[in-house]
Amino acid sequence: MKQIITRFPPSPTGHLHIGGARTALFNWLYARHTGGRFILRIEDTDVERSTTQSAEGIIKSLEWLGIDWDEGPYFQSRRMEVYAEYIQRLLASGHAYYCTCSPERLKERRERALAEGRNPTYDGTCREKALPPSDDAVVRFRTPDTGKTVLDDRVKGGIAFDNAEIGDFIIQRSDQTPTYNFAVVVDDITMGINTIIRGDDHVTNTPRQILMYRALDSELPLFAHVPMVLGRDRSRLSKRHGAMSVLEYRDTGYLPDGLINALVRLGWSHGDQEFFTRKELIELFSLEHIGTSAGVFDPDKLLAINAEHIKKSDPAALAPHLLPLLKEKGYAAENNDYLHNAIHTLLLRSKTLKEMADKAAFYYEDPLSYDPAATAKFLVPENMEILEMLAEKLATLDSLTEKDQEPAFTAVMEKTGKKFGKIAQPVRVALTGRTESPGIFETIEALGRRKTLERLADAVEMIKKST
């Protein structure tokens, strides 16, 4: 069986968004599932709109998602000699010709055709003139006058297109640059691409591409056109639906695996399963399970999926993603056991890493900031004995596991006659500055002996100064 070779060919005219990221993911997963190859190609022939910054952003987005490529990135702007060679092949074989029709004339004929309810295809004025090359000449592909071009699509099935409705289309502009449809075909042929998975907005391009494959005596790739991604109101996905770029999701605290899980469910399914690891996706992905109806992007569902991935994550694996967010807040955080222990206490309490960074603040604040209302309510003289006694008990322990801490809390409860809740809350405020935090036992264990005792002592001093 021939090795599967897929590609992702973004245009660097902006950020990588949900639709493009899903296309990249489907191609990458299929290549990895089949033991094939995945190629990254930057389609930057639109000189006016393409930017280096956008290309770099797309590459960073893919790297963050963990979508790695086996070849590339190739840049179309550096392949002009290849396109020129293939233009000459089509001219020599009679499948293409020079055209000098002015833009004004073409515009006039187009407007007239539309006004008369006709398809505005080229009328063939230059088709049989055998014109020589010139500065103002474009190159057109000679489309058959009759018959149909059939697309056998793995998702949509068979689709037939009347050749007469396609017309002779431009494949090289007068400035010698190739048009999109032509460059794509040449690239896919020369790079050995044999499987093309893309959005179904490309279906109308496909008959033109099939005709060029045949004119160049090249084997057709397998086409799989995936339904578009829509917003919850069933219109084309945009920012007003809450969709952001991939890098914005990174900066907002989403996990790569969380976003990938949500992306793959926009058009692909495996029974009723909602949550997938990356390994599972590679094992399970197939074209047969791509649906025929549009995927609907739901920000709330993405958030829930992300929370599930955070909950199931190894703290050590989350640390590199959380660290930049903590440093952004000005904390001297490092990727060490202290950070891993802090993360462990927050796995069930955080839907995003940004939320986790906010909730982890008390682990790194020095000095600790206190919520005024919490201080006024709990750091009061009648609770000073609780803090002093607990500090004394904790200082003698060999370790701070929950099992080791329980007798210390029990002793304080017995001595003061207060229930656990009445003890835990003043301790929580003393250690975190807040009334909400992870469980008190795990908080103490994560803070460690030195910080726990220092903060209990600081709280006692604060109470003394306030009286």
From Swiss-Prot:
It comes from the Bacteria. Binds 1 zinc ion per subunit. Its cofactor is Zn(2+). One of its GO terms (cellular component) is cytosol. Keywords: Aminoacyl-tRNA synthetase, ATP-binding, Cytoplasm, Ligase, Metal-binding, Nucleotide-binding, Protein biosynthesis, Zinc. GO terms for molecular function: ATP binding; glutamate-tRNA ligase activity; tRNA binding; zinc ion binding. A motif ('HIGH' region) lies at residues 10-20. NCBIfam families: gltX_bact. PANTHER family: GLUTAMATE--TRNA LIGASE (PTHR43311), GLUTAMATE--TRNA LIGASE, MITOCHONDRIAL-RELATED (PTHR43311:SF2). HAMAP family: Glu_tRNA_synth_type1. Catalyzes the attachment of glutamate to tRNA(Glu) in a two-step reaction: glutamate is first activated by ATP to form Glu-AMP and then transferred to the acceptor end of tRNA(Glu). This is Glutamate--tRNA ligase. It comes from Desulfosudis oleivorans (strain DSM 6200 / JCM 39069 / Hxd3). The lineage of its organism: Bacteria, Pseudomonadati, Thermodesulfobacteriota, Desulfobacteria, Desulfobacterales.
